[in-house]
Swiss-Prot record:
Highest taxon of source: Bacteria
Protein name per the record: Fructose-1,6-bisphosphatase class 1 2
Gene Ontology annotations of biological process type: fructose 1,6-bisphosphate metabolic process; fructose 6-phosphate metabolic process; fructose metabolic process; gluconeogenesis; reductive pentose-phosphate cycle; sucrose biosynthetic process
UniProt subunit comment: Homotetramer.
InterPro entries per the UniProt record, alphabetical: FBPase_C_dom (IPR044015), FBPase_class-1 (IPR000146), FBPase_N (IPR033391), FBPtase (IPR028343), Fructose_bisphosphatase_AS (IPR020548)
Family according to the record: Belongs to the FBPase class 1 family.
Note describing how the cofactor binds: Binds 2 magnesium ions per subunit.
Length: 331
């Protein structure tokens, strides 16, 4: 598997890393297409560093990416599936990766993916990743869906490739267009409504009010439970995604990892003209304090992300900006 990288102005080292990522991505796509025929990729095999259950494909993907990057310019490899940073060599780059995002969807044939982030290597392994998201030199994902696609930014817009399985090449497509200013879709797990903080409930209440509410139009809700799939949809047609912190034990800071998931997605979305925050402040200017730190996450069309932040500025007794106290499923 190879990827078309002509005219992107990449250094030889970065281009080589992208070729290695694409090669493994293509291999994983083929493996997923045969799930259940030879191996149950959704079989539980343990628990990762963050306390989440691991599927067989989580471990397979992590091992494959780590092995492929050995001997490359990647000195430090940080994986959501590993407790600590793995040192691969003495190169000039550091790569953070969620090898298999959305693994709970493997056995139901829903799109899953790989998320990656590339930094210049720092003096120590952890320092290479505990830094501002604005310091990323590349970030992207591979989505394993009806098509296998790779989306990446090198800080100059967002590029898009689709895997030509017959030729074994990720073909470059038209670049991702800027996100629209307006949107009529939002993504959130509404079953957790009772646990959300008031500002999030207020924002969703006003969207649910539709044409009769302060937004003056109807909205559709989406929820795939696969961050890569949610991101791809938003990049293709707009929208806003919310995974807030809530009052459940272990969910106070949400469930998504800053280093492995939120920072790279925030980099992509920002390069597409959108916004990304923890509900109040930009993700890209937040400093994670540990490798597996979690953060609330809101991203998508810039206006909607800013609107969520504005709801957090309302007086504490307010639960809706214009319509007073109202529940999600009440008029």
């Amino acid at each position: 598997m190879t990827i078309e990288l002509e005219d992107l102005g990449l250094t030889p080292e970065l281009a080589d890393v992208m070729q290695r990522l694409a090669r493994v991505g293509g291999q994983i796509a083929r493996l997923i297409s045969r799930n259940g025929l030879e191996t149950d990729l959704a079989a539980g095999v343990g628990t990762n560093a963050g306390g989440d259950g691991q599927k067989a494909l989580d471990v397979i993907a992590d091992n494959a990416f780590r092995a492929a990057l050995a001997g490359s310019a990647v000195a430090h490899y940080a994986s959501e599936e590993q407790d600590e940073v793995v040192t691969l060599g003495e190169g000039a780059l550091a790569l953070a990766i969620d090898p298999l995002d959305g693994s709970s969807n493997i056995d139901v044939n829903v799109s899953i993916g790989t998320i990656f982030s590339i930094f210049p290597a720092a003096e120590s392994p952890e320092a290479s990743f505990l830094r501002l998201g604005t310091e990323q030199i590349a970030a992207g994902y591979i989505i394993y869906g009806p098509q296998c696609a790779l989306v990446c930014s090198f800080g100059r817009g967002v590029h898009h490739w689709v895997l030509d399985l017959d030729a074994g090449i990720f073909r470059r497509m038209a670049d991702i267009r800027p996100l629209p200013a307006e949107t009529s879709e939002f993504a959130i797990n509404a079953s957790n409504y009772r646990h959300w903080p008031k500002p999030v409930r207020a924002f969703i209440d006003d969207l649910m009010a539709g044409a009769d509410g302060p937004r003056g139009k109807n909205f559709n809700m989406r929820w795939i439970a696969s961050l890569v799939a949610e991101t791809h949809r938003i990049l293709m047609r707009g929208g806003v995604f919310l995974y807030p912190g809530d009052d459940r034990k272990g969910y106070e800071r949400g469930r998504l990892r800053h280093v492995y998931e939120c920072a790279p997605i925030a980099f992509l979305i920002t390069q597409a003209g959108g916004g990304a925050s923890d509900g109040c402040d930009p993700i890209l200017t937040a400093l994670p304090d540990r490798l597996h730190a979690r953060t609330p996450f809101v991203f998508g069309c810039a206006g909607k992300v800013a609107c969520v932040a504005a709801y957090h500025d309302l007086p504490g007794q307010e639960t809706s900006a214009l319509f007073g106290t109202r529940g999600l499923f009440r008029s």
